[in-house]
């Protein structure tokens, strides 16, 4: 699925003696090339395993939820769907903010596996549109395995009476995991301007999922706002109360670490 995004916004100032070559953003940026090269066969294998397990569990749990469905559950199920979308949106923002703002690619294990894609994305925002389904969704599938496994265990071990009582809660958890699983796919669609399925553009236009115009706000350096990337519903209210800025001030005051220092380092790489 190919696409092109508008320029990622104003970028960090570079020294005057840097060449035009060093000022390029996108796939030819020195930092983007280095980060892309860190994607390893081992990482690919982990993503494949995560996707297969995740979607197997989704299918298993969905069948059980459908078999247990009753009309009288409808109001609580609707509430669970909305609540699941809201919680998923907040969690997507929390993870996105944490990975964008703190840590380093040099950290053991999580650096190359988890933080690396966030650094690459700010330098080359359209790289995500060149990622296939496995690379796009592998990490999110890994994260949602635990709640999906727990749900499958309950369906296998709990009595019908207990499952009847738990049904609204399990619908909430299932919706939360579905939105969580597809968050990066939704994020990819927000960067894709050509060839999107019609139903995806409808969901974006209705703001059921993250719209393309909405997400552009985040891609203005230094990438310090609008972190929620599932539905984007919480971005404006969190910005109004200065939620992320207050968290950053608190952490910087306690640790002395400067927000987005590693992100800026990669953005300024020229060779």
From Swiss-Prot:
Disruption phenotype: Body weight is reduced in homozygous deficient male and female. Deficient mice lack plasmanylethanolamine desaturase activity and have dramatically lowered plasmalogen levels in their tissues. InterPro entries: Lipid_desat, Plasmalogen_desaturase. It catalyses: a 1-(1,2-saturated alkyl)-2-acyl-sn-glycero-3-phosphoethanolamine + 2 Fe(II)-[cytochrome b5] + O2 + 2 H(+) = a 1-O-(1Z-alkenyl)-2-acyl-sn-glycero-3-phosphoethanolamine + 2 Fe(III)-[cytochrome b5] + 2 H2O; a 1-O-hexadecyl-2-acyl-sn-glycero-3-phosphoethanolamine + 2 Fe(II)-[cytochrome b5] + O2 + 2 H(+) = a 1-O-(1Z-hexadecenyl)-2-acyl-sn-glycero-3-phosphoethanolamine + 2 Fe(III)-[cytochrome b5] + 2 H2O; a 1-O-octadecyl-2-acyl-sn-glycero-3-phosphoethanolamine + 2 Fe(II)-[cytochrome b5] + O2 + 2 H(+) = a 1-O-(1Z-octadecenyl)-2-acyl-sn-glycero-3-phosphoethanolamine + 2 Fe(III)-[cytochrome b5] + 2 H2O; a 1-O-(9Z-octadecenyl)-2-acyl-sn-glycero-3-phosphoethanolamine + 2 Fe(II)-[cytochrome b5] + O2 + 2 H(+) = a 1-O-(1Z,9Z-octadecadienyl)-2-acyl-sn-glycero-3-phosphoethanolamine + 2 Fe(III)-[cytochrome b5] + 2 H2O. Its main location: endoplasmic reticulum. It is a multi-pass membrane protein. The record marks 96, 121-122, 187, 191, 215, 218-219 as: Essential for catalytic activity. The keyword Transmembrane applies. GO terms for molecular function: plasmanylethanolamine desaturase activity. Keywords: Endoplasmic reticulum, Fatty acid metabolism, Lipid metabolism, Membrane, Oxidoreductase, Transmembrane, Transmembrane helix. Pfam families: Lipid_desat. GO terms for cellular component: endoplasmic reticulum membrane. Residues 1-25 are annotated as: Disordered. Changing residue 187 to A: Loss of plasmanylethanolamine desaturase activity. Does not affect endoplasmic reticulum membrane localization. A motif (Histidine box-2) lies at residues 214-218. Changing residue 191 to A: Loss of plasmanylethanolamine desaturase activity. Does not affect endoplasmic reticulum membrane localization. Its EC number is 1.14.19.77. The keyword Iron does not apply. It is found in: Endoplasmic reticulum membrane. It comes from the Eukaryota. The chain crosses the membrane at residues 48-68, 75-95, 166-186. Pathway: Lipid metabolism; fatty acid metabolism. A motif (Histidine box-1) lies at residues 187-191. Histidine box-1 and -2 together with other histidine residues are essential for catalytic activity. Belongs to the fatty acid desaturase CarF family. Plasmanylethanolamine desaturase involved in plasmalogen biogenesis in the endoplasmic reticulum membrane. Plasmalogens are glycerophospholipids with a hydrocarbon chain linked by a vinyl ether bond at the glycerol sn-1 position, and are involved in antioxidative and signaling mechanisms. This is Plasmanylethanolamine desaturase 1. It comes from Mus musculus.
